[in-house]
Regions:
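Cysteine endopeptidase catalytic domains of the caspase/legumain-like
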Residues: 2, 25-322
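N-terminal secretory signal peptides that target proteins for export/translocation
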Residues: 1-7
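Bacterial N-terminal signal peptides
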Residues: 8-22
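Low-complexity, intrinsically disordered short peptide segments enriched in small/polar/basic residues
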Residues: 7-8, 27
C-alpha cells in the first residue's frame, strides 16, 4: 500500500507563490501633468497655452483621465486648468500625484515655456520663483515605483538631462546643453506629433515617446535647413536603453490602440500582431519587476526591447516596399 505524505510548509509556500504569479497584474494608470511657464508677452503666453491644451485634449481623447494642467494664466481657460503654475502649486501638484499614483503607473510631465541657465544650473521660468533642475529632481524622487517620462521643451533644457536621468525615467529635452538658450521650435513639432499619422511610423494607431521625439527633431532640422540657418537646438532623449524603452511608452492607455493592422496585407498584419504581443510582454514584465531579481529583470527587458526594435524595423522595411 502506497502512502501519501501530507503537504508540508514547502508545498504551501510554492502554492502561494504560484497563485501570486498567476494572479492578473493590476492595470497601469497614466497620469499627465502639464505646466506652462512665463510667456513674457501675450503672444508667447497664448502659444504655450495652445500647445498645452493640445496635449491635454489629446490625452483625454485617448482615455487618460488623470490630467492636471497648471497655467501661467488660468483665466485663459478656467475649465481646463487646475491652478496657476507657481512654484508652490507645482510642488503641490507633484506631491498630490505621488500620493495617488500606484506602483508601476506611468507619470508624464511636460514643461512648455522658457528656460534659463546661469552657467551652473538650469531652471524653468515660472510666475514668481523658478524651479531649478535640482528642484525637479527632488520632486521626481517621490516616484520610486513608477516610470517617469519628463519632457522639457524649453530653451536651455539640456541642463536638466544629467540631473534628472536615471533608472525608470525617460528624459526628453529640446536642447543638448544649457548653453543652447535660443527660443526652441521643438515643442510645436512634439505636440503636433502626438496626433500625427506621419509620426506613427509603425502604424499601430498610437505615437510613442520615441516616435514623437524623432518626428519633432527631424522637423526642427528641416526647418532650419530650409531657412538656411545654423541649427541652434539639438533635442536629446535619455531612457537608459538607446531609445528602445521610449518606443514602448505612449500617452494613451493600451486599450486605446486603433486596429491599424485590420486592413493590412497578411504579412504586415502578422508583423503588427507580433509587435503588439511584444509590447504586451514588456508591460507585463514591468508589472513583475518588484518580484524579480534585478539582474534577471534587466536581462529579460533588454531582450524584449531588442526584439521589439527589430520587429518595428521589419514593419517599416515592409511598408517602405509598398
Amino acid at each position: 500500500m502506497t502512502s501519501r505524505l501530507a503537504p508540508g510548509p514547502i508545498f504551501f509556500c510554492l502554492a502561494a507563490l504560484w497563485l501570486a504569479l498567476a494572479r492578473p497584474a493590476a492595470a497601469q494608470d497614466i497620469h499627465l501633468l502639464v505646466i506652462t511657464g512665463v510667456g513674457g508677452d501675450d503672444e508667447h503666453s497664448s502659444r504655450f497655452h495652445k500647445w498645452a491644451v493640445a496635449v491635454v485634449d489629446s490625452a483625454k481623447r485617448r482615455g487618460v483621465s488623470d490630467v492636471v494642467y497648471l497655467s501661467e494664466k488660468p483665466e485663459l481657460d478656467p475649465a481646463r486648468t487646475q491652478g496657476r503654475s507657481t512654484k508652490e502649486n507645482v510642488t503641490r501638484a507633484f506631491n498630490d500625484l505621488a500620493g495617488r499614483a500606484k506602483a508601476n503607473d506611468e507619470i508624464f510631465v511636460m514643461l512648455l515655456g522658457h528656460g534659463s541657465f546661469d552657467g551652473r544650473q538650469g531652471a524653468f521660468n515660472l510666475p514668481g520663483p523658478d524651479l531649478s533642475a535640482a528642484d525637479y529632481g527632488v520632486l521626481l524622487d517621490r516616484f520610486k515605483t513608477q516610470h517617469i517620462t519628463f519632457v522639457n521643451t524649453a530653451s536651455a533644457s539640456g541642463a536638466f538631462l544629467q540631473v534628472l536621468a536615471g533608472p525608470g525615467r525617460t528624459i526628453v529635452t529640446a536642447t543638448k546643453t544649457g548653453g543652447e538658450r535660443n527660443e526652441t521650435r521643438f515643442p510645436a513639432f512634439f505636440v503636433e506629433a502626438l496626433d500625427s499619422e506621419a509620426a506613427d511610423r509603425d502604424r499601430n494607431g498610437r505615437v510613442s515617446v520615441l516616435e514623437a521625439f524623432d518626428y519633432a527633431k527631424g522637423k526642427v532640422t528641416a526647418a532650419y535647413e530650409q531657412e538656411g540657418h545654423i541649427l541652434t537646438e539639438h533635442a536629446t532623449l535619455d531612457d537608459g536603453n538607446d531609445g528602445k524603452f521610449a518606443a514602448t511608452l505612449y500617452l494613451a492607455p493600451r486599450g486605446s490602440r486603433a486596429s491599424a493592422g485590420a486592413n493590412a496585407d497578411p504579412a504586415l498584419r502578422a508583423l503588427l500582431e507580433q509587435r503588439d504581443a511584444l509590447e504586451d510582454q514588456v508591460a507585463q514584465l514591468r508589472l513583475r519587476k518588484d518580484n524579480m531579481d534585478p539582474a534577471r529583470y534587466e536581462q529579460e527587458l533588454e531582450k524584449l526591447l531588442t526584439d521589439l526594435a527589430l520587429k518595428t524595423k521589419a514593419i517599416r522595411d515592409l511598408e517602405a516596399k509598398k
